[in-house]
């Protein structure tokens, strides 16, 4: 009977050990996948913080300068380029793997390191704060997009969008139709549009703050992963 008891007990411990090792392997795989996702995220945020947003603000300034200082007639292409680039939105999307891990409790609970779990939950709180604000901003951006056709006819606006699809960044002079005309040459209409762009400009500045917070959280999480799991490149 003793031998049977010992055999059963050893079998139980062996099975428990196998499950433990399997769970540890899964945990490390989850963290490694998340690490790769966050590394891509830091690159994306670096671009938004240091390249896109400064250039976006410069196009808002250009729109003001050109509408304030130039006659509308004869400067359609130059003004249109500045205005359209002031409505080019690069939208940040949070890391996919991070969101999927948090939405699946069975996956999240495979992470046994409490320090790491707490850090991921804090990271998720930062992402949620950004998401709520970005949803509000998206509504303003949509209203700006739809009002652009009050200044430029739909056909020309479509050509500009086609150029944006090719460029996938701010438009160049060559992307602006040579025959472009405004639907109105009343500067007051353009001033109203500029006021709406200014609202977006202020909100983009707020979004920059969220980007910096998330970027710093990315960096801190990556450091923590490397410290706790000794992950290889």
PLM regions with names:
Residues 16-233:
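Long, hydrophobic alpha-helical segments that serve as membrane-spanning/inserting helices
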Residues 1-21:
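Membrane-embedded hydrophobic alpha-helical segments
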């Amino acid at each position: 009977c003793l031998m049977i008891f010992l055999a059963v007990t050893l079998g139980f411990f062996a099975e428990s050990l196998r499950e433990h090792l399997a769970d540890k392997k899964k945990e490390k795989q989850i963290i490694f996948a998340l690490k790769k996702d966050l590394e891509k995220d830091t690159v994306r945020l670096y671009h938004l913080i240091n390249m896109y947003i400064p250039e976006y603000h410069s196009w808002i300034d250009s729109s003001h300068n050109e509408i304030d200082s130039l006659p509308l007639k004869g400067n359609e292409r130059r003004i249109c380029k500045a205005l359209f680039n002031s409505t080019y939105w690069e939208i940040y999307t949070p890391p996919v793997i991070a969101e999927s891990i948090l939405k699946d409790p069975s996956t999240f609970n495979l992470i046994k390191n409490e320090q790491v779990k707490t850090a991921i939950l804090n990271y998720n709180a930062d992402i949620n704060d950004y998401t709520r604000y970005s949803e509000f901003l998206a509504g303003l951006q949509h209203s700006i997009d739809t009002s652009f056709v009050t200044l430029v006819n739909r056909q020309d606006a479509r050509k500009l969008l086609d150029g944006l699809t090719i460029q996938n960044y701010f438009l160049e002079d060559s992307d602006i139709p040579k025959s472009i005309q405004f639907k109105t040459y009343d500067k007051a209409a353009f001033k109203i549009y500029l006021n709406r762009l200014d609202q977006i400009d202020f909100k983009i500045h707020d979004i920059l703050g969220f980007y910096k917070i998330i970027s710093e959280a990315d960096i801190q999480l990556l450091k923590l992963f490397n410290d706790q799991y000794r992950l290889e490149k």
